[in-house]
Design a protein with these regions (language model features):
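A short, conserved alpha-helix in the catalytic core of glycosyltransferases
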Residues: 263-266, 274-300
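Long helical/loop segments within the catalytic core of UDP-sugar-dependent glycosyltransferases
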Residues: 116-142, 147-156, 160, 164, ...
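N-terminal signal-anchor transmembrane helix
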Residues: 30-89, 105-108
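Short aromatic/hydrophobic "clamp" motif used to bind/position activated sugar donors
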Residues: 167
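N-terminal membrane-anchoring/stem segments of glycan-assembly enzymes
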Residues: 1-58, 240, 372-375, 401-408, ...
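Membrane-embedded multi-pass helical conduit in multi-pass membrane proteins
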Residues: 54, 354-452
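Cell-envelope/extracellular polymer assembly enzymes that use nucleotide-activated donors
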Residues: 60-63, 91, 265, 280
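A conserved acidic beta->alpha catalytic loop
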Residues: 96-116
């Protein structure tokens, strides 16, 4: 019996080692592609006239969709911030999804909302819309009040009432850089076959605000928040850019993405029966366009910045990651027919297998790998020197990738101007490998068991908001002065 156990453990250890090597090779390839893409972007950035896109009446107008559920502390500040976007023509459609707090009252008080008879432009099924409101103080504001149906249902209601050909889906607790819309719209106008573009999401915890706008980017003092900053940088700069440049991007963050409205209406909008409605929509767009032999460019752009609050307590973080993993499982299961089908190109033959074997099964393999590796060490199947060497190699490789994305951030964007911020992030890149990453692997593995028992609902998190509201009026007048932004002026970021 002992001999059989040793054979099983030895076989699993060999499998785990091979799995680890393949995964690290994929990460390396994505990081190399991402680095080259960042270098290319930095080189070409001065040639992109985002100011012209922001000011031109020929630019494609945008409907910003903001689904909101119990967002009273931050919704007014978020909306006023969105209204300062440097873009010629846009509307902000806030969808109050049956909030039980003062979200609707806060919007009414701030903008003097008046109920109107606005006819929807599409008929994606949603929960009952109780009323549509506009603001005589700010004509770009539209508020939809509806029965609760979840985030996807709220977004579908927003799509139905949006009047422009592009819609930008963002979370109610997020803040956009002033020129974010013009940067994303550039992609649609430069490449007409573009169906969707995702922008990078950054963590705002610890930063300073002035008049409801982000004044100074700082890293937070909270350890969990700093660990998530490293995660986000690695996911977006070290992974998503690589997938995008390879034509295999499957995920656009629900916090910030720009889509062609007509194509999304064709596929039926967001799926309200899944918790991962954002990723599921992207995969459905790929599938829809390929099945009809239509061009489908879905890409990621690293510069338009969306700022969001992240969880600062363990309970909220665990619930968030469980929800994300369940959404990923649902997405892959629903579109499993795409797997290894040449009809779907690299999406079906490369991206889908990766997500199944490394994103879905990865946490389970990782957790069992830890447990069986320790058991092998106890039984003497694996020697202590080998175990220590393997741990050292794994840690070193993880640190190299984390340091690389920090370097990429510094090379291209320099959003963290202080040396103390960079030192804090560097230390967190080390700390996350001891306990934090393993904890998240357990949470993601557990998602298989929570999937069947969970109903679709909003993921709630305590918000701190974005500081004081803009003084006076409803929103500041957008400033299109290129000197306010070094990139708009065609200049590189200033030296520290």
């Amino acid at each position: 019996m002992t001999g059989l156990l040793e054979q099983i453990l030895h076989g699993f250890n060999v499998f785990t080692l091979g799995y680890f090597i393949v995964l690290q090779l994929i990460f390396t390839l994505l990081a190399v592609v991402g680095w080259r893409a960042i270098e290319d972007y930095v080189e070409r950035r001065p040639m992109r006239d985002y100011r012209a896109v922001a000011e031109s009446e020929m630019s494609m107008p945008v409907s910003i969709l903001v689904p909101a559920y119990n967002e009273a502390p931050s919704i007014v500040a978020s909306l006023r911030s969105l209204l300062t976007s440097q873009f010629v023509e846009f509307e902000v459609v806030v969808v109050n999804d049956g909030s039980t707090d003062e979200t609707m009252a806060a919007l009414t008080d701030a903008f003097g909302l008046v109920k109107v008879g606005r006819v929807p432009r599409s008929n994606i099924p949603t929960q009952l819309v109780r009323g549509v409101y506009t603001s005589p103080l700010e004509p770009r504001v539209v508020v939809i009040d509806k029965v609760n149906g979840g985030k996807a249902d709220a977004l579908n209601a927003g799509i139905n009432h949006a009047v422009y050909p592009l819609f930008c889906a963002i979370d109610a607790d997020t803040m956009l850089d002033a020129d974010a819309l013009s940067r994303l719209v550039w992609e649609f106008q430069a490449e007409p076959e573009t169906v969707a573009v995702g922008g990078i999401v950054r963590i705002v915890n610890g930063s300073e605000f002035e008049d409801g706008r982000l004044a100074k980017v700082r890293t937070p003092r909270n350890l969990l928040a700093n660990l998530q900053i490293i995660e986000y940088l690695r996911a977006f700069l070290g992974g998503r850019i690589g997938w995008s440049k390879s034509g295999m991007l499957l995920i656009i963050s629900g916090a910030f993405g720009l889509f062609r409205r007509d194509v999304c209406v064709e596929v039926g909008g967001y799926d309200p029966t899944t918790v991962g409605e954002d990723a599921e929509l992207v995969l459905r767009l790929h599938r829809h366009q390929r099945e009809r032999k239509k061009p489908c460019r879905i890409t990621f752009f690293p510069d338009p910045i969306c700022w969001t609050e992240c969880p600062e307590d363990l309970g909220t973080l665990v619930r968030q990651r469980d929800r994300w993993q369940r959404g990923l499982i649902e997405m892959v299961v629903r579109h499993r027919k795409m797997l290894l089908r040449p009809r779907y190109g690299r999406i079906g033959c490369v991206a889908m297998p990766y997500f199944i074997f490394f994103e879905l099964l990865g946490p389970t393999i990782e957790c069992f790998g830890y447990a069986l590796f320790v058991l092998s060490l106890v039984l003497g199947i694996v020697s202590l020197p080998f175990a220590l060497a393997f741990f050292a190699v794994s840690l070193t490789y993880s640190l190299v990738l984390s340091f690389l994305v920090i370097l990429m951030e510094e090379r291209a964007f320099r959003r963290y101007p202080g040396w103390s911020d960079l030192i804090r992030l560097t230390l967190c890149a080390v700390v996350e490998n001891v306990g934090y990453r393993q904890m998240l692997a357990v949470v993601r593995m557990r998602s298989w068991y929570t999937l069947a028992s969970r109903k679709q609902h909003w993921g709630e998190m305590t918000r701190k908001g974005f500081g004081p509201l803009l003084p006076g009026g409803v929103g500041a007048v957008p400033c299109l002065d290129p000197t306010a932004d070094p990139v708009l002026a065609g200049e590189a970021p200033t030296e520290r």
